[in-house]
Amino acid sequence: MAKHLFTSESVSEGHPDKIADQISDAVLDAILEQDPKARVACETYVKTGMVLVGGEITTSAWVDIEEITRNTVREIGYVHSDMGFDANSCAVLSAIGKQSPDINQGVDRADPLEQGAGDQGLMFGYATNETDVLMPAPITYAHRLVQRQAEVRKNGTLPWLRPDAKSQVTFQYDDGKIVGIDAVVLSTQHAEEIDQKSLQEAVMEEIIKPILPSEWLNASTKFFINPTGRFVIGGPMGDCGLTGRKIIVDTYGGMARHGGGAFSGKDPSKVDRSAAYAARYVAKNIVAAGLADRCEIQVSYAIGVAEPTSIMVETFGTEKVPSEQLTLLVREFFDLRPYGLIQMLDLLHPIYKETAAYGHFGREHFPWEKTDKAQLLRDAAGLK
């Protein structure tokens, strides 16, 4: 592979679509805390002055949707009307029904291991050894930039920052290896009083320089900081937000393929979410074991059927053992049936709200980020 550029973007927790994702997952967590077997598909829409929470939920739990919604918006930082959105005064509407019994009969089984998939679909997982968290560098650093924006906003370092922000990082590759950063874009909502020059200087010093490794920056690296010149109107006042509209931000920044299913607001019986987590777990353990430098896993399901309809392993020519052997190892060491992967990754806990901003992958405390099977895979593959 010759020289090329690759770009990924991220958005902050205050982006309208991410507000929606976090509300949906906050509702899911509150329900799972009381009822781990609940069936939850929670969708959220946000716009100026209102939040609509809808979907299909079947549970023995009772949760206060309005309180959860307001608390989530408050934690993000929308607490004054001058930001265009206020947790204390926005309307909260609820339109929630129950899961279809036609779906339910295909999922539930007397033997949990025979639990069927909640829907058909295809999911991908990916890992690469180009960063210490075995994630692509462009999405990793795009996330870290907007995480830093939230940090300096909340701790008062840059008090004129507002919650909505976006980042984008373009990396330079030569023969598949990172050689530098070509361009950085960071747009952040801000208070009226800050001027463009002061904002650009502060963002460079407090957000960009502490995050991006200096060895990847050079005289030709281009920086675009609030390139429109003004970003006062933002959040739900600037754009409406919907659950599940940032699926590439949530995953690998475009570096890997995507099956199309969103994550937030879905309980683990929905393989759109749980099987994508399991596929990441498989791919990461293969790379951590040194069996490949890059690995992409595809898995697919039929509704109501436990066994995956297919498993595919792609290593882009970086494999250290034959591809056929890798597929056999995946089938031997990973149970990718819906209930099997729920047990394997211990998914019936309220851990999902935290996933809903700054990426579902590459953050070591999530259970699908464990590399506990790497040595087993290495030994089974016969590598010294």
From Swiss-Prot:
Protein name: S-adenosylmethionine synthase
Subunit structure: Homotetramer; dimer of dimers.
UniProt keywords, alphabetically: ATP-binding, Cytoplasm, Magnesium, Metal-binding, Nucleotide-binding, One-carbon metabolism, Potassium, Transferase
Chain sites annotated for binding K(+): 43
Record-listed ATP binding positions: 15, 164-166, 230-231, 239, 245-246, 262, 266
Gene Ontology CC: cytoplasm
GO terms of biological process kind: one-carbon metabolic process; S-adenosylmethionine biosynthetic process
Binding site for Mg(2+): 17
Pathway info: Amino-acid biosynthesis; S-adenosyl-L-methionine biosynthesis; S-adenosyl-L-methionine from L-methionine: step 1/1
EC identifiers of the protein: 2.5.1.6
Function: Catalyzes the formation of S-adenosylmethionine (AdoMet) from methionine and ATP. The overall synthetic reaction is composed of two sequential steps, AdoMet formation and the subsequent tripolyphosphate hydrolysis which occurs prior to release of AdoMet from the enzyme.
